[in-house]
């Protein structure tokens, strides 16, 4: 039995690690900057959580785990290093945990990791393979942001930021897509592709890689690999491809066909959006290659009802439907808005909170283009996350560019005022959606609290 201290324990991934360690019989505690539903839940599970960071929290007998978002001058991290304690970055520690599992399925990609990881986890669970699953969101069908199973299968998200996934040693890899992101760390798209190439090369010869044939960047990485690469596509013949794709109000169904043109099964999705055709094809490809019965896969995908903050319907007031989505990249925003436009009876009103100054600066034109799909955009202040604003950019710059592009938009800096504005302007049949990876979803809570009418 060891004692662990997690700096940033309230994070979605760190809280899952904390609970896994607790389940394995270790003593676990940690700290976070603010109280949250997660920190309260951890205390209920018997994990001590400090609010705020203080060097006195470190006693000298702990193994310390921290996230990439923790600054180097964090007092707990500084003291742990000064005392010579074992200190691990989150991804590094996860890589060590993986050694305990026979089959590690690591899902990578700029977009869609959480949904695809959750879907694969649920398929394996339905197939009675008793997987351990670690995801970046709450998933109803997994009972949380993780589930503990046997040491046969571990399903985990693999993030490229600061090359985190290069700490992993998966036996099965998934590459959903490769896009410009995290440009505070990566120099350009070529350096991002190089990181994914290194990730793919970690897959052993007796494993396999599932890759998106329709993504040019993915194909340029996968086509040079000597490992077993299994391609999926919605556009052309592949190992697994979607044929006869149809949709009704934003919900898709399709036939899965293999490279020999054999019809395997018909998939019907219970989560909206064309992007989920890709996510479900990737999940199908992994599960079918593992030997899981196609009907079990089909049933699991149909039953899968999504992850928190992924086009999540949060309520309805007087005919106005409220959604929240984690999209924080132009490609994701475009996919989300195209889906919401199909779901909406009237207007789509977006409350957008940019996530990090560096992303806003580097992808500004992409944000303008993608947000232009909305009927109305309310821009609020940047969620800084790990950053200080050394980029000379703000949400007001985005607001001005949207106005110049002819987008109906407002800049409102306080969530309370946003809630009041929405309640005064939204009409029956409209969809109101918070979009962003920060805390913009609090606006929905305020709208629901302030609304005199519930429906």
Curated annotation (Swiss-Prot):
<dbReference type="InterPro" id="IPR000713">
    <property type="entry name" value="Mur_ligase_N"/>
</dbReference>
<dbReference type="GO" id="GO:0051301">
    <property type="term" value="P:cell division"/>
</dbReference>
<dbReference type="Pfam" id="PF08245">
    <property type="entry name" value="Mur_ligase_M"/>
</dbReference>
<dbReference type="Pfam" id="PF02875">
    <property type="entry name" value="Mur_ligase_C"/>
</dbReference>
<dbReference type="Pfam" id="PF01225">
    <property type="entry name" value="Mur_ligase"/>
</dbReference>
<feature type="binding site">
    <location>
        <begin position="109"/>
        <end position="115"/>
    </location>
    <ligand>
        <name>ATP</name>
    </ligand>
</feature>
<dbReference type="GO" id="GO:0005737">
    <property type="term" value="C:cytoplasm"/>
</dbReference>
<dbReference type="GO" id="GO:0009252">
    <property type="term" value="P:peptidoglycan biosynthetic process"/>
</dbReference>
<keyword id="KW-0132">Cell division</keyword>
<keyword id="KW-0133">Cell shape</keyword>
<keyword id="KW-0963">Cytoplasm</keyword>
<keyword id="KW-0961">Cell wall biogenesis/degradation</keyword>
<dbReference type="GO" id="GO:0008763">
    <property type="term" value="F:UDP-N-acetylmuramate-L-alanine ligase activity"/>
</dbReference>
<comment type="pathway">
    <text>Cell wall biogenesis; peptidoglycan biosynthesis.</text>
</comment>
<keyword id="KW-0547">Nucleotide-binding</keyword>
<protein>
    <recommendedName>
        <fullName>UDP-N-acetylmuramate--L-alanine ligase</fullName>
        <ecNumber>6.3.2.8</ecNumber>
    </recommendedName>
</protein>
<dbReference type="GO" id="GO:0071555">
    <property type="term" value="P:cell wall organization"/>
</dbReference>
<keyword id="KW-0131">Cell cycle</keyword>
<dbReference type="GO" id="GO:0005524">
    <property type="term" value="F:ATP binding"/>
</dbReference>
<dbReference type="InterPro" id="IPR050061">
    <property type="entry name" value="MurCDEF_pg_biosynth"/>
</dbReference>
<keyword id="KW-0067">ATP-binding</keyword>
<comment type="similarity">
    <text>Belongs to the MurCDEF family.</text>
</comment>
<keyword id="KW-0436">Ligase</keyword>
<comment type="function">
    <text>Cell wall formation.</text>
</comment>
<dbReference type="GO" id="GO:0008360">
    <property type="term" value="P:regulation of cell shape"/>
</dbReference>
<dbReference type="InterPro" id="IPR005758">
    <property type="entry name" value="UDP-N-AcMur_Ala_ligase_MurC"/>
</dbReference>
<keyword id="KW-0573">Peptidoglycan synthesis</keyword>
<dbReference type="InterPro" id="IPR013221">
    <property type="entry name" value="Mur_ligase_cen"/>
</dbReference>
<dbReference type="InterPro" id="IPR036565">
    <property type="entry name" value="Mur-like_cat_sf"/>
</dbReference>
<dbReference type="InterPro" id="IPR036615">
    <property type="entry name" value="Mur_ligase_C_dom_sf"/>
</dbReference>
<dbReference type="InterPro" id="IPR004101">
    <property type="entry name" value="Mur_ligase_C"/>
</dbReference>
């Amino acid at each position: 039995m060891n004692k662990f201290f997690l700096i940033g324990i309230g994070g979605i991934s760190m809280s899952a690690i904390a609970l896994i360690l607790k389940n394995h019989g270790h003593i676990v505690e940690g700290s976070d900057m603010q109280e949250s539903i997660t920190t309260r839940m951890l205390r209920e599970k018997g994990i001590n959580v400090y609010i705020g960071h203080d060097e006195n929290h470190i006693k000298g007998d702990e193994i310390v785990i921290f996230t990439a978002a923790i600054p180097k001058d964090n007092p707990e991290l500084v003291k742990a290093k000064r005392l010579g304690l074992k200190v691990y970055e989150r991804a590094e520690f996860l890589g060590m945990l993986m050694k305990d599992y026979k089959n590690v399925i690591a899902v990578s990609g700029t977009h869609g990791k959480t949904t695809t990881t959750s879907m694969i986890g649920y398929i394996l669970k339905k197939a009675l393979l008793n997987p351990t699953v670690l995801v970046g969101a709450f998933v109803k069908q997994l009972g949380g942001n993780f589930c503990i199973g046997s040491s046969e299968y571990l399903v985990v998200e693999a993030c490229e930021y600061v090359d985190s996934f290069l700490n992993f040693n998966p036996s099965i890899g998934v590459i959903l897509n490769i896009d410009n992101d995290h440009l505070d760390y990566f120099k350009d798209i070529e350096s991002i592709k190089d990181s994914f190439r290194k990730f793919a090369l970690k897959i052993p010869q007796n494993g396999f890689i599932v890759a998106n044939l329709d993504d040019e960047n993915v194909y340029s990485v996968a086509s040079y690999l000597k490992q077993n690469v299994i391609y999926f596509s919605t556009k052309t013949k592949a190992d697994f491809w979607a044929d006869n794709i149809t949709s009704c109000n934003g919900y898709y169904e399709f036939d899965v066909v293999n490279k020999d043109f054999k019809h395997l099964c018909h998939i019907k999705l219970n989560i909206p959006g064309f992007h989920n055709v890709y996510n479900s094809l990737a999940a199908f490809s992994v599960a079918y290659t593992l030997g899981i019965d196609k009907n079990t896969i089909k049933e699991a995908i149909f039953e899968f009802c999504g992850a928190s903050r992924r086009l999540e319907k949060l309520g309805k007031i007087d005919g106005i439907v409220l959604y929240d989505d984690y999209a924080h990249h132009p490609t994701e925003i475009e996919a989300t808005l195209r889906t919401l436009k199909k779901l909406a009876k009237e207007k789509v009103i977006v409350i957008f909170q940019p996530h990090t100054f560096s992303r806003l600066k580097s992808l500004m034109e992409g944000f303008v283009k993608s947000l232009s799909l909305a009927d109305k955009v309310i821009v609020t202040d940047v969620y800084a996350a790990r950053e200080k604003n050394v980029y000379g950019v703000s949400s007001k710059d985005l607001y001005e560019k949207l106005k110049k592009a002819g987008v109906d938009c407002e800049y409102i800096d306080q969530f309370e005022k946003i809630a009041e504005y929405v309640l005064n302007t939204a009409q029956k049949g409209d969809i109101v959606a918070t979009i962003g990876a920060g805390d913009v979803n609090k606006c929905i809570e305020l709208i629901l609290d302030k609304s005199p009418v519930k429906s």
